[in-house]
Each structure stands twice: as structure tokens, then as C-alpha cells.
A protein has these predicted regions:
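Extended, well-ordered alpha-helical scaffold segments
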Residues: 6-9, 62-73, 137-153, 198, ...
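Acidic/polar, glycine-enriched structural segments that form the non-catalytic walls/loops
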Residues: 1-41, 59-64, 70-80, 210
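Loop/turn elements at helix/coil->beta-strand transitions in domains of secreted/extracellular proteins
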Residues: 2, 9, 59, 134, ...
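Structural recognition of the beta-strand scaffold that forms the well-ordered cores
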Residues: 5-6, 13-15, 52-53, 61-65, ...
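Extended, hydrophobic/aromatic-rich amphipathic alpha-helical segments that build helical scaffolds
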Residues: 3-17, 118-127, 143-153
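Glycine-rich (often Gly-Gly/Gly-Pro-rich) flexible segments and glycine-rich loop motifs
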Residues: 42-84, 187-205, 210-211
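The feature captures the catalytic groove of carbohydrate-active enzymes
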Residues: 24-40, 88-140, 154-213
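Alpha-helical support elements that line or immediately flank enzyme active sites
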Residues: 13-16, 47-61, 115, 119-135
Length: 213
């Protein structure tokens, strides 16, 4: 009974906080003009945790404002990839609000090095398709976003001496590698797994639609 109440409470909060925009850090309950962290969209943890509830709660329509916001910032995401990493495709920053440019630079939190954003959000696109089986959505919205995310890795990844691809620089949000004073690292597990999930999903989606063969 307790777990059911917790689920229902979370579902109520998420539905209430979602409108034409996805829920930000404080939802609609900030009650101040200066909320913590500016009440932004923290994309490297907070926002994905919230939107991951949508499909489980049988509210797939609430995913659409997230996709609308991401697609509105596609040109900014392309600027991030090109100007910061000299790569094709898109780079979703660790935070955004009124634009999608990656301008959060900090000596302690190397958020610029977080690579998993576009890949992680691509998985939400593919999850939405798997839940709804909407092939028009897969063709017109999901796969184009996923392809742009994959293009980034085509340029970014370099092959190491052992034949394996290297993610460098890399960053797992708010995690310090062992025996290191810096959170910046090489081959953060989060970055590797996000790219793995993205590329597998691109292959599956392409097979479903009969494209990219």
C-alpha cells in the first residue's frame, strides 16, 4: 500500500508539473523569482529522472513537451558539437533554460565534458516509440534526433592502441574517479553505456523503418 501511494503521489506531481514545457527543477512550485539553480532544466540527472516516470505511469503524452523543447534547441546543440568538440551532430549540455548552448563552465564540475546527453535523450525517443508503436513518430522525430546524436560519436571517438574506442574527455556527473582529485576522466561508464544504448537503438529503429541499410 505504501509503494502504491508513493507511485500515485509521484504521478500526481509529474502530471501537475508538465504542461507546454517539461518540468524544471522546482516544477511549478518555486514560489520565488530566484529559485535554486535558477529553476533550470538539469539534463544530466534531474530531468531524466522525472521524465522516466511518464511511460511507467501510462502518460506518454507528457513526453511530447520534452521532445518539443529538445527539437527547438537543435541548432544550438549543433553549435555545441561543432564549436566545443569540432564534431558533427549534436551535443546536449548538462543544463539549459532559454537556449541550448553549452555555457556552463566550472573548475570543480567539468560539465562541458559530459557527453551522454544527446544519447540519453535519444533513448527516451525510442522508448516512446516502443510504448506507442507510432511509426510516424519514429520516422519523423525519433530517428532524426537519434541520427544526429550518433553523428557526434562518429567524429568524437578515437581508436586506442588496443583497438577499442576512447571517450576523452569524459565525465560522470558528480562522481570522482578513484584516486583522482578531478571529476574529469577518460571512458566514464555513463558515457560509454549511453553511446552503446544509442547506437543499438539507431540500428533497431533503422531496421524497423527499412532505412540506413
Amino acid at each position: 500500500a505504501l509503494v502504491e501511494k508513493l507511485f500515485d503521489a509521484a504521478r500526481y506531481n509529474v502530471i501537475s508539473a508538465t504542461g507546454i514545457n517539461p518540468p524544471n527543477l522546482q516544477g511549478i512550485w518555486g514560489a520565488t523569482m530566484t529559485p535554486p539553480w535558477s529553476g533550470d532544466y538539469t539534463t544530466n540527472g534531474n530531468l531524466p529522472v522525472v521524465v522516466s516516470h511518464y511511460l511507467q505511469a501510462n502518460t506518454p503524452e507528457l513526453m511530447l513537451p520534452l521532445f518539443d523543447r529538445l527539437e527547438a534547441y537543435m541548432e544550438d546543440f549543433k553549435v555545441n558539437a561543432r564549436e566545443l568538440f569540432n564534431c558533427q551532430g549534436i551535443h546536449v549540455p548538462s543544463r539549459f533554460s532559454s537556449h541550448g548552448l553549452n555555457n556552463h563552465f566550472d573548475a570543480t564540475w567539468p560539465m562541458t565534458f559530459w557527453l551522454a546527453g544527446a544519447a540519453w535523450y535519444s533513448l527516451f525517443y525510442y522508448d516512446y516509440y516502443m510504448y506507442t508503436l507510432d511509426k510516424d513518430f519514429l520516422r519523423e522525430r525519433a530517428l532524426p534526433f537519434m541520427e544526429q546524436a550518433a553523428l557526434f560519436y562518429e567524429d568524437f571517438l578515437k581508436e586506442g592502441n588496443d583497438g577499442k574506442y576512447i571517450f576523452n574527455p569524459s565525465y560522470s556527473p558528480e562522481n570522482n574517479p578513484a584516486n583522482s582529485s578531478s571529476q574529469a576522466c577518460v571512458n566514464a561508464t555513463m558515457d560509454v553505456m549511453a553511446a552503446n544504448g544509442l547506437l543499438r537503438s539507431v540500428i533497431e529503429a533503422s531496421q524497423i523503418l527499412g532505412v540506413n541499410q
